[in-house]
Amino acid sequence: MAGAGERKGKKDDNGIGTAIDFVLSNARLVLGVGGAAMLGIATLAVKRMYDRAISAPTSPTRLSHSGKRSWEEPNWMGSPRLLNRDMKTGLSRSLQTLPTDSSTFDTDTFCPPRPKPVARKGQVDLKKSRLRMSLQEKLLTYYRNRAAIPAGEQARAKQAAVDICAELRSFLRAKLPDMPLRDMYLSGSLYDDLQVVTADHIQLIVPLVLEQNLWSCIPGEDTIMNVPGFFLVRRENPEYFPRGSSYWDRCVVGGYLSPKTVADTFEKVVAGSINWPAIGSLLDYVIRPAPPPEALTLEVQYERDKHLFIDFLPSVTLGDTVLVAKPHRLAQYDNLWRLSLRPAETARLRALDQADSGCRSLCLKILKAICKSTPALGHLTASQLTNVILHLAQEEADWSPDMLADRFLQALRGLISYLEAGVLPSALNPKVNLFAELTPEEIDELGYTLYCSLSEPEVLLQT
């Protein structure tokens, strides 16, 4: 009897398996690539639930060698957005089968399949071209309607930043004439015409003057902390030049120039000593220091519904190394200065586009707008997206405007691959992992969100 029951269960299971195979084999014809992918995932989930229901109650759940549940046996009690290592392996295999050519994605609404005659090669190429142009047109429409900032808004925001920079420069020279500073200057995506959606932030770089014989920079990877992309600024020759020989000795902590202490020094000036309401009235702006934790940020209301945030960013230059006081996400690294790569990255991107009238910057701005408008992608930074484009530019030579859709899809696929590996090397300094400050959970959520949209990228344009 037991044997008969076992055979019966096996027969039933084979029947369900046959039905599932039939549904999946015909799903793509009816639903297209995106629909087939989603149906496959849902069908697999139902089959797993059925398998568990008919299995013995005491049978243990199969675990992977690492002790975690595998992609084949998902943890139903966990978050669907957190992918363990085995699930990432399955994700990698799945990526190999997904299409990357924009012509693969049918943007038309669903209609019943009809018998079609065998098309000639020219007709097939024409259809692919039309589908590619459909995605291309949607990307361009998204850029015009959602990503691009009106020229007038950009000009007014830049003028507000210039006015405040001039006032701050005059105040520091008058009140702190002994503070060794070079001329402040504006930087950031708004200044470089790479900002999207709204003109709402810019950086004010404040260069400190350091004596070259009293200070040196030590790469983070050469320290016990082993943090590439960050530096320690060490005070040198204290036996010959005692404390007080440099103005910035007051900001030394444990023998190193502390970016946190430097930032605190400027915070007292920016937030505590300057009468911003009076300056705002003079300039016809509403100016106030941003609340914590944005200690070195000014919020400027330059129109009724327009706000600009100005980040006050101290900077030091030693030799060819430019560092900024932008802290690491982890508090234990608050004594480290961040290596400034953004100016060089932007210059390379601009040079590449100027050389061939390419669409690299346009593709980057569309990606930035998507991430800015999609909360689940909010952890991706402009620097990370810029480096994805720079890496892709090394692989692909043709960046003519009509290739925008193809390059956009390749950038999405490349970004998912970097997230899967947990490593995005800097295009200018490969030792620097631009994902190093993301947590595993953040990386998994980003990868999950992008992977789910890869079969139907138009979804990203609807946020």
Curated annotation (Swiss-Prot):
GO terms for molecular function: ADP binding; GDP binding; identical protein binding. Its main location: mitochondrion. Residues 47-463 are cytoplasmic. Pfam families: Mab-21_C, MID51-like_C. Residues 1-23 are mitochondrial intermembrane. Keywords: Membrane, Mitochondrion, Mitochondrion outer membrane, Nucleotide-binding, Phosphoprotein, Transmembrane, Transmembrane helix. It is found in: Mitochondrion outer membrane. Expression is relatively high in heart, skeletal muscle, pancreas and kidney. Residues 160-169, 234-242 are annotated as: Important for interaction with DNM1L. The chain crosses the membrane at residues 24-46. One of its GO terms (biological process) is positive regulation of protein targeting to membrane. It is linked to Optic atrophy 14: A disease characterized by visual impairment in association with optic atrophy. Atrophy of the optic disk indicates a deficiency in the number of nerve fibers which arise in the retina and converge to form the optic disk, optic nerve, optic chiasm and optic tracts. OPA14 is an autosomal dominant form characterized by adult-onset progressive reduction in visual acuity, and pale and excavated optic disk. Optical coherence tomography discloses a severe loss of the retinal nerve fiber layer. Belongs to the SMCR7 family. Homodimer. Interacts with DNM1L. This is Mitochondrial dynamics protein MIEF1. It comes from Homo sapiens (Human). The lineage of its organism: Eukaryota, Metazoa, Chordata, Craniata, Vertebrata. The gene is MIEF1.
